[in-house]
Amino acid sequence: MKKVLIAMVFLLTAAVSIAADKKSGTIVMEFDLSAHPENGEAKLWVPYPVSDADQLISNIRIEGDYAESAVYTDREHSTPMLFARWNEGAESRRLSFSFDVERDEVLVRDLQGGEKAWNRNDFAPWLEPTRLGPTDGVVKALADDIVEGRTTVLGKARAVYDWTVENMFRDPDTRGCGPGDVCALLQTRGGKCGDIHSVYVALARSAGVPAREVFGIRQGRKDGQDLTGWQHCWAEFYLPGTGWIPVDPGDVRKMMLREKLELDDEKTAEYRAYFWGGIDPYRVKLSTGRDLILNPPQQGDPVNYLMYPFAQIGGETLDWLDPEGFSYRITYRQ
């Protein structure tokens, strides 16, 4: 399995060598909104990582010519975000945000089917539908079919994982990480990590399994590497008596595409086993939560997720999937 992990991380990040249990570095995010029209306030929200059991965030540095800046959370998901504002007419609108990260490999193995009693009400936020991830209709019908005969949270979560690996595929033409429109995806079956894990989460929730997406970015392998398009998300389900368990069927399908693997190949089985309860350390968790009302609130609809920077100038939203037009860059430092 160690050789499998090394091969997996090499292909995901083109790393020459790895430490299988930890990965550290510095992430630098640079924004320059100066070229956009000056007719209105400029507001910028950036996902703000925090330390947890699997990652240590330190040495945070925020610099810029903004009129105000602060770190807030939203009210529903407690998603941290860095907010900055520039006054109308400001000719220069720049911000630099960097932090050091030390990330652990997560391996939750020997999962058991016996589960402690749990109260669904305690996990209501992770059982509810989202705007693009319903838990009724065709999604519920499919989930019921997938978990038929399974009576435990673990059994249902595994059945949904297996179905997702076997029936979804990675579509490299998808823009960004994908919007995660579950009903559309059940028709096309193709997308990137945001799509594949939205399907997993919606099906798991429909089957009564608490689940959530985790939005982040991959770490690089060498100093100065451009990470601007390296956003990645994965999923977690809650196993009573154990806690949140990571799964990444999206990376299984990514490896299958890169290595031209079929479902019945031995390497596919190895990746499939690794990403059930395991994730590599070459990533940083940035946020969770869908359908966000930012803080301060943005104008318009809820934000689908906060994995990319979000900005509005005079109330008009910039395209966060166009880094050049938006004008931001993310760099890895060692």
Segments the model singles out, each with a brief description of its role:
Residues S198-Q298:
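Hydrophobic/aromatic-rich core segments of domains that either
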Residues A19-L107:
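Intrinsically disordered, low-complexity N-terminal segments that are enriched in acidic
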